[in-house]
């Protein structure tokens, strides 16, 4: 079977709470770093989440 193009990434909260989401993205079509506004349950607000590598 062929390997998939999608890679696992981690979206880390910019609020500094340590909260993160995991998702996948296609590095071939979207080589730039992902930034999304998502809900951070620790501070109970919508904040910017930035892409980081999964260790």
UniProtKB/Swiss-Prot annotation:
Name of the protein in its database record: Large ribosomal subunit protein bL33
SUPFAM superfamilies linked to this entry: Zn-binding ribosomal proteins
Alphabetized InterPro entries for the sequence: Ribosomal_bL33, Ribosomal_bL33_CS, Ribosomal_bL33_sf, Ribosomal_zn-bd
UniProt-listed NCBIfam families: PRK00595.1, rpmG_bact
Source organism per UniProt: Sodalis glossinidius (strain morsitans)
Record-linked HAMAP family: Ribosomal_bL33
One Pfam family hit: Ribosomal_L33
UniProt entry keywords in alphabetical sequence: Ribonucleoprotein, Ribosomal protein
Claim: Lyase is one of the keywords in the record: no
GO terms assigned for molecular function: structural constituent of ribosome
UniProt xrefs under PROSITE patterns: RIBOSOMAL_L33 (PS00582)
Gene Ontology biological process terms in this record: translation
Entry similarity comment: Belongs to the bacterial ribosomal protein bL33 family.
Gene Ontology cellular component list: cytosolic large ribosomal subunit
